[in-house]
Amino acid sequence: DMARNIRGGMPKQTPEGYNRPIDGQPDPWSPFDPKFGGFWEGGTHWSEVVRDDAIEFMGHAKKSENPFFMYIAFNAVHDPRQAPKEYIDRYPLSRIKMPENWLPEYPYKDDIGCSARLRDEKLAPFPRTENTIKVNRQEYYAIAEHMDEQIGRVLENLEKSGMADNTYIFFTADHGLGV
């Protein structure tokens, strides 16, 4: 009987978030600048908005004797890979490791339908460089950690509410292609 905060869809995509960074050129994108919209739409990070919605929902659900169903859709770690600056700073590029199987271009990409026209392949320019891979990983790690902390706050609130022992939690995701 209670539906709240129905928020559908993905954050607004901006062209500056794709095909970057290009070595030797200034990066037009900043993962922590709200001017690019995306996860910063309205000035608050989307994962924090979703967290607050979930906590508010649990407050209403606690007042009822009936069981409740809550579906929380964190769009992170999806692109655009945006996180607060403090999270980006936790992952200096000098400490980001390159995958052992890294190639500037995957030789069979066209054969498997993974051409440069595919949206996830537009996240970085071809040929890929070590700097590009490290920047993309830095942003991915930062947004993943930020989302993880928001989920932790939801779980802390669930524990404090006294409803945790009578709650099932299912965590699923469809992310990872762009990393």
For each of these PLM feature ranges, what is it?
Residues 2-179:
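Active-site-proximal cap/lid insertion segments
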